[in-house]
Amino acid sequence: MLFRYLVWLFRFIEVKNVVSISLLVIGSNYLTTAISNNTSTTISPTTSSNYLLTAISNNTSTTILPTTTSSNYLTSAIPNIISDKEDDTPFSTDKTVSDGLSPITLYRAIRSTLNDTMTDILTRPYRPTTVIFHSDTPQPVKNATQGNIIKKTYRQVLTFFIQPNPLFPCFKNHEVFLNLANILNTILCIILIKNV
């Protein structure tokens, strides 16, 4: 289930006009895959004991905003400021967010999110935390209140997390989320996009 979730995660990374992509998978094994001249849209990273097929489609993806919570229920991480009716649009793969998030920023945000999750679990196991980030900042912005596009996408992603989905079980226990964080930390990827 967790690896199916990872497939879903990487499928929504927005990639446009890519000439060359270098994918570095951090784990027990290292694999570098290059895509040149826009002739392929499939990346297949490999870990030591599992195989993960990742498809990145041009102009059809939605940027993923990582979220983290150390409380027992993920719903507690939804701020009241983004509970407007216009933000309750169901999550759809057809919607493209024009935020222009760079892969390096995504990598830093994921790493920071995982670090915050580890710290919160060990020292403050019941304090809810939300992490979202802007494309023009090198690090995540905690409890951000500006940016309608970011808030709307954040709401959509959280809604997709909470509702039952066959891809992965609902994250209602912080231990389950921590296990996912450990897996992500093991196969954390740096995606380098050149000539975008």
Swiss-Prot record:
Q: Membrane spanning segments where?
A: none
Keyword annotations for this protein?
Answer: Late protein, Repeat
Tell me which positions the record assigns to the signal sequence. Answer: none
Give the induction annotation. Answer: Expressed in the late phase of the viral replicative cycle.
Give start and end residues of every sequence repeat: 28-48, 49-70, 71-92
The Swiss-Prot or TrEMBL record describes its family as follows:
Belongs to the asfivirus I196L family.
**What name appears for this protein in its UniProt entry?**
Late protein I196L
